[in-house]
């Protein structure tokens, strides 16, 4: 029978519930269990697809095209699984589904209420995740903080699941904070005690408490928490700030967290073999070289907006024994006069995805600098579109060339709407989303990176390269090295007379893994290291 683990949070948000859940998932997978994982977000948006990155951080896209929470990126990178649309559920999705059923008459004229209709829908999303993946263990992270009004239906639903399927099949893990008061010189357990009290008042008794802390937690403090929270002392797990995220699974294993989980859920699996993971962490901690990459974006104040890009750069660096330092460059501040000052000290330039016109001209200036100065360049999504526009303007001389998204009246729409998007009015969920094939041209940097004729990558865009400009740009040295299998949609572009200038319409960062870097990122970092060594 499938086992269910629920991870909740208390005291404050951003405690690392997602990393805790992902780390536990890795440990259980290495015990030979089939693990899947999902995130429940209590906000009323249907998904984060139309939310500002300042509000939510990165939108992570799954193979099947779901626009999801950035925690799913952590889940995929840690557990090395590909998640799906059932892996991220919001209040908006739950209510939308219930209201559609009510309109279809599925409730037989009954009064639709939070209990049982909303809670039943939530429970069905939990069970469906296990069914769709045939999982041995389903880990579900409940977003937000215990005590939030928005979280109540989710907490009630997971409380009911224990009654539905039995205590041996359900486990509750509560993540809290033990703050350190510098003035008093001591750590305080009271916020955790009150958070657990709040959770218990809702009918949920945690089986494990994971305490986030800056300082070591003494045995006396663990005993105190165990007493007041009514759990075993060994089930108080310390989650101290780590030098690398990838060390967290090893820390949890040292404290026998995965064994406690298996004992409670009656899972008789051998201990997790973390030999390869330990080697990875040792490598990360002992990188001997450095390279600096400029990330020119519009959301650089909130680095979570580009979290998968940064992780993909780091993964690529690991394979070259190199620590990749990211220099954050606000695209709005980049001009032709200061671009040398802002990116001249870097070994490679990356322009990531984005929407809207803010910061676009600064990105184009940075791209021109990379092209003219032979600096390795990687463009992603909007970065690929702007690389095409920069070439059209400054090499072909098409003054005013632009994207019809940025300037609908441009005389040269190098980037235009996909034909199927012309009459779409809704913004949410209507992009070209998910995994699509890309055919690579031989003897190109893209082909050399992948070493395969056809690859599959994840997309999230509405606009595409306008094919009427392909002949002229090809004549001028612009290479269309990746297209859709029918050749209609441009997927990857690069330059003939440049050591490494590649840009992709898709989002390669989404499939990178710490032990298996994404090929374009791998080759980009290699080119950046070569550039540094040649200076």
Curated annotation (Swiss-Prot):
GO MF, any single term: metal ion binding
Any single GO CC term annotated in Swiss-Prot or TrEMBL for this entry: cytosol
Keywords (A to Z) from UniProt: ATP-binding, Glutamine amidotransferase, Ligase, Magnesium, Metal-binding, Nucleotide-binding, Pyrimidine biosynthesis
Keyword RNA-binding carried by entry: no
Residue ranges of every copy of the Glutamine amidotransferase type-1 domain listed in the record: 292-534
Active site: 381, 507, 509
Binding locations of UTP: 13, 188-193, 224
Superkingdom of origin organism: Bacteria
InterPro entries membership: Class_I_gatase-like (IPR029062), CTP_synthase (IPR004468), CTP_synthase_N (IPR017456), GATASE (IPR017926), GATase1_CTP_Synthase (IPR033828), P-loop_NTPase (IPR027417)
Pathway(s) this gene product operates in, as recorded in its UniProt entry: Pyrimidine metabolism; CTP biosynthesis via de novo pathway; CTP from UDP: step 2/2
GO biological process: 'de novo' CTP biosynthetic process; pyrimidine nucleobase biosynthetic process
EC number, as in UniProt: 6.3.4.2
Positions annotated to bind Mg(2+): 71, 141
Region of interest: Amidoligase domain: 1-267
Reported regulation of activity: Allosterically activated by GTP, when glutamine is the substrate; GTP has no effect on the reaction when ammonia is the substrate. The allosteric effector GTP functions by stabilizing the protein conformation that binds the tetrahedral intermediate(s) formed during glutamine hydrolysis. Inhibited by the product CTP, via allosteric rather than competitive inhibition.
Task performed by this protein: Catalyzes the ATP-dependent amination of UTP to CTP with either L-glutamine or ammonia as the source of nitrogen. Regulates intracellular CTP levels through interactions with the four ribonucleotide triphosphates.
Note: CTPSs have evolved a hybrid strategy for distinguishing between UTP and CTP. The overlapping regions of the product feedback inhibitory and substrate sites recognize a common feature in both compounds, the triphosphate moiety. To differentiate isosteric substrate and product pyrimidine rings, an additional pocket far from the expected kinase/ligase catalytic site, specifically recognizes the cytosine and ribose portions of the product inhibitor.
UniProt similarity note: Belongs to the CTP synthase family.
Summary of subunit composition and partner proteins: Homotetramer.
Record protein name field: CTP synthase
This protein's encoding gene: pyrG
